[in-house]
Swiss-Prot record:
This is Photosystem II protein D1. Pfam families: Photo_RC. It comes from Prochlorococcus marinus (strain NATL2A). The keyword Iron applies. Cyanobacteria usually contain more than 2 copies of the psbA gene. It is an enzyme of class 1 (oxidoreductase). PANTHER family: PHOTOSYSTEM II D2 PROTEIN, PHOTOSYSTEM II PROTEIN D1. Its main location: membrane. Its EC number is 1.10.3.9. The keyword Cell membrane does not apply. The record marks 162 as: Tyrosine radical intermediate. PSII is composed of 1 copy each of membrane proteins PsbA, PsbB, PsbC, PsbD, PsbE, PsbF, PsbH, PsbI, PsbJ, PsbK, PsbL, PsbM, PsbT, PsbX, PsbY, Psb30/Ycf12, peripheral proteins PsbO, CyanoQ (PsbQ), PsbU, PsbV and a large number of cofactors. It forms dimeric complexes. Keywords: Calcium, Chlorophyll, Chromophore, Electron transport, Herbicide resistance, Iron, Magnesium, Manganese, Membrane, Metal-binding, Oxidoreductase, Photosynthesis, Photosystem II, Thylakoid, Transmembrane, Transmembrane helix, Transport.
Amino acid sequence: MTTIQQQRSSLLKGWPQFCEWVTSTNNRIYVGWFGVLMIPCLLAATTCFIVAFIAAPPVDIDGIREPVAGSFMYGNNIISGAVVPSSNAIGLHFYPIWEAATLDEWLYNGGPYQLVIFHFLIGISAYMGRQWELSYRLGMRPWICVAYSAPVSAAFAVFLVYPFGQGSFSDGMPLGISGTFNFMFVFQAEHNILMHPFHMAGVAGMFGGALFSAMHGSLVTSSLIRETTGLDSQNYGYKFGQEEETYNIVAAHGYFGRLIFQYASFNNSRSLHFFLASWPVICVWLTSMGICTMAFNLNGFNFNQSVVDTSGKVVPTWGDVLNRANLGMEVMHERNAHNFPLDLAAAESTSVALVAPAIG
């Protein structure tokens, strides 16, 4: 009994030091308890992604025995390469290595995709928790991790919620450049995302956030308080940790208020920076919500043949042009799976030409 207690005490001897090291804010890079989970998960996801991108064999993504190659060793380059999503034959089943009869079978059915995305999602969630943990240790407010939740929600939407809604991980976003574009085209074809208000909010958030960031940076740079001569860079006029303002917010406020109008300019630095953070974050949240609703086929607005003249004849609009483009993309994707688009099969045929050409 004494021997067992001595062994246990020797095993736990370094535990307090380990806890202190994990939670110490004096480390060059903060680890934290969330970091204990984050580091192995992101390492596993990154390692599997790199190996699969270089050497993974083709994957039967559609479940029809027609494998799609995505790795360098099978003829792809950095643009066309991808980690191909797991097979439609697997569906939503959890598919770790031990569920396959052989490693070749696991690779053929796209097992690396699930390994990467599951470890990646756990890793970025732990990274978000680590941001909160470090803020808590330093006595800061928790808004950094709240802002980071926007891209995290987007990742969960395309890698987890959308496959759940569509019934198969084969519908998830491929892990590559061309695969991402293919995912976007197919998403537009099947869900008309461009006509969804939440996607429009996301576009406003991205372009608006870039505009506001450029406006703020240029205003601050243009109203710096000169502390140097003309021979030195103005950057030398700032000392890290100085208490004085480094730019004149009154001058920036006055300039922008006269450029647009008075109330278009913030006179409070704190509310200004809250707006700069909240605008893109809220809009990306909305976009993620839109992806999650479209995952269950609550799609964007449909304005097909919505304008008619007094005789009931359809007056074509850009909505009809968009619909025709959607149909074209839909019939082209998964062209060997022989899944005829339901909206083409169910609706009346749309004439391409108004008058049949004369023969002879």
